[in-house]
A protein has these predicted regions:
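Intrinsically disordered, acidic Ser/Thr/Pro-rich low-complexity regulatory segments
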Residues: 75, 79, 85-344
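N-terminal helix-turn-helix
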Residues: 16, 26-81
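Alpha-helical hairpin
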Residues: 4-5, 40, 69, 87
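Short, locally clustered residues in the helix-turn-helix/winged-helix DNA-binding domain
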Residues: 17-21
Length: 344
């Protein structure tokens, strides 16, 4: 809470933010007097709102007699929402049904999480999947494709999966590749992909014996790491931007979409905003002016104490913070549990 506000100003500011989030219309003193039990006259409310504007908590649009919250006003409101309220029974049921009906494999979790968050919050969702290089090797498996080819499947504990078609060299058999998978699994089990050493590779080569088959194994692991310093980014609900009154300016929306199309920029934003627990970055707290009319809510997810990735909601500064925060917090817990269950 802000120390420069007395209790009456806090009540009025809270009411202004709450009403503006619900209505998207500038809030006047008469509206507050009618809808909220403040126990004071519209004239007194009007004077207090003028003080709140002078203190930087409210802004006065030129085309309206009412006022809207500033980034500072929203910050007051969001800080007052702690601790986060639990999800409703209906929200909980939808989240559980979504995962139950749509997720069968670990590699489906992240895309469906992005779709779920966007669907429930009606905002843009961002899900940063685990980094391949930091993931712990789980298993290399080969599946027969035809006489001359097999499908190599590399899996990690964090849900990363790399599929690649490999050629079976002349003189080799599918059984040779199965033997090679056994040697790789025995040597690398429980080891981070980025920690694989030359000594590990020598052990695998010695166990396999055949140089051409060994090269195929190394190529699969190299492919898994190539360009994967960060995990894959999943977006959901970008069309939701146009449903908000704040984003009827097409130039503003176009600028946001251009940034969202740049995976490297979005990952930088998520890394900047991510912290312990739930982090809310509001309006002009964002470094990029493209998002000065937007807010990010981010959360990091962990398995076995290891940081795996980030999930986030992007919406207008007028977003329904209470709902978005409780949804993201609950989905974050379920995502962690889902990864843990499906990795075994």
């Amino acid at each position: 809470m802000s120390n420069d506000l007395d209790e009456r100003k806090r009540q009025i500011l809270w009411a202004v933010v709450d009403d503006y989030i619900a209505s998207a219309e500038p809030v006047g003193s008469r509206t507050l007097a009618q809808k909220y039990n403040l126990g004071i006259s519209p004239a007194t409310i009007r004077n207090e709102m003028a003080d709140l504007e002078m203190l930087g908590y409210l802004e006065h649009p030129h085309t309206s007699a009412g006022r809207v919250p500033s980034s500072k006003g929203y910050r007051f409101y969001v800080d007052g929402l702690q601790p986060i309220a639990p999800v409703t029974d209906a929200e909980k049921a939808k989240i559980h049904d979504w995962y139950k009906g749509r997720v069968r494999r670990l590699d489906e979790v992240f895309q469906e999480t992005a779709r779920l968050i966007a669907d429930v919050t009606h905002n843009v969702s961002l899900v940063l999947a685990p980094q391949a290089a930091q993931s712990t090797f789980r298993m290399l498996q080969f599946l027969p494709l035809d006489l001359g080819h097999a499908i190599a499947v590399l899996m990690t504990d964090a849900g990363f999966v790399e599929n690649r078609i490999v050629e079976i060299p002349d003189g080799a058999t599918f059984a040779d590749f199965q033997r090679m998978a056994g040697a790789v699994n025995q040597t690398l089990s429980g080891k981070a992909l980025c920690a694989v050493t030359k000594q590990d590779l020598r052990r695998i080569r010695d166990a396999i014996g055949d140089e051409s088959i060994f090269v195929a194994a190394v190529e699969v692991m190299h492919r898994a790491l190539e360009g994967r310093e960060d995990g894959r980014l999943y977006l959901g609900g970008t069309a939701q931007l146009l449903s908000n009154p704040e984003f009827q300016d097409l130039d503003r929306v176009r600028a946001m979409l251009l940034v969202l199309e740049r995976e490297d920029l979005v990952k930088d934003i998520l890394h900047t905003h991510a912290g312990e627990g739930l982090t809310v970055t509001i309006g002009r707290e964002n470094e990029s002016s493209t998002f000065w009319d937007s807010s990010f809510i981010t959360a990091t997810y962990h398995v076995d104490g290891k940081l795996l990735g980030t999930i986030a909601v992007l919406g207008p500064t007028r977003m329904e913070y209470a709902k978005a925060m409780r949804i993201l917090d609950y989905v974050n817990t379920n995502l962690t549990e889902m990864i843990y269950q499906l990795k075994w």
